[in-house]
């Protein structure tokens, strides 16, 4: 018999993460590497594990992630979003817990585009009075 799997897609900035939850002992594999090899910051790794700790499922699932686009922070946010969605598929009773923590909401903040006549999105060229 095929083993049970739960899927979730997470997005943040320009990163997209395809997350698969498989019953296991709590390992997190990102792009066929351990999470500590892929994401350098311990704070970001804790951020990724947040949905699992909130729902007390940290040791019950192995998390297999395929993520692309963006940087470390965006990828961490996308993975977290994907894990939350996959947990919801595994057990719909987690909805209130995850929703209250804001883990099911897609963070819509994006980089603001650069405008012509300016040095950045809002930074104006230096003003000279004389």
UniProtKB/Swiss-Prot annotation:
Please provide the record's keywords in A-Z order: Ribonucleoprotein, Ribosomal protein
Listed GO biological process terms: translation
- Tell me a Gene Ontology molecular-function term this record carries: structural constituent of ribosome
Q: Write down the PROSITE patterns for this protein, in alphabetical order.
A: RIBOSOMAL_S9
Disulfide connectivity for this sequence is none
A Gene Ontology cellular component where this protein is annotated is:
cytosolic small ribosomal subunit
Q: Does the keyword Hydrolase apply?
A: no
Mind telling me which residue stretches traverse the membrane in this protein?
A: none
| Family label | Belongs to the universal ribosomal protein uS9 family.
Question: Per its record, how is this protein called by name?
Answer: Small ribosomal subunit protein uS9
- Provenance organism: Bacillus licheniformis (strain ATCC 14580 / DSM 13 / JCM 2505 / CCUG 7422 / NBRC 12200 / NCIMB 9375 / NCTC 10341 / NRRL NRS-1264 / Gibson 46)
Biological classification of the source: Bacteria, Bacillati, Bacillota, Bacilli, Bacillales
The UniProt gene name for this protein comes to rpsI
């Amino acid at each position: 018999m095929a083993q049970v799997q739960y899927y979730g897609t997470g997005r943040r900035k320009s990163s997209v993460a395809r997350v698969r939850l498989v019953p296991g002992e709590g390992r997190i594999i990102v792009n066929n590497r351990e999470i500590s090899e892929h994401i350098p910051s311990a704070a970001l790794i804790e951020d990724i594990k947040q949905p699992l700790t909130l729902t007390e499922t940290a040791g019950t699932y192995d998390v297999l992630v395929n993520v692309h686009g963006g940087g470390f922070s965006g990828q961490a946010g996308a993975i977290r979003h994907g894990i939350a969605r996959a947990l919801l598929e595994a057990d719909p009773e987690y909805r209130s817990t995850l929703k209250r923590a804001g883990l099911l909401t897609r963070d819509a903040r994006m980089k603001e585009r650069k405008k012509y006549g300016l040095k950045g999105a809002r930074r104006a060229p230096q003003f000279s009075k004389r």
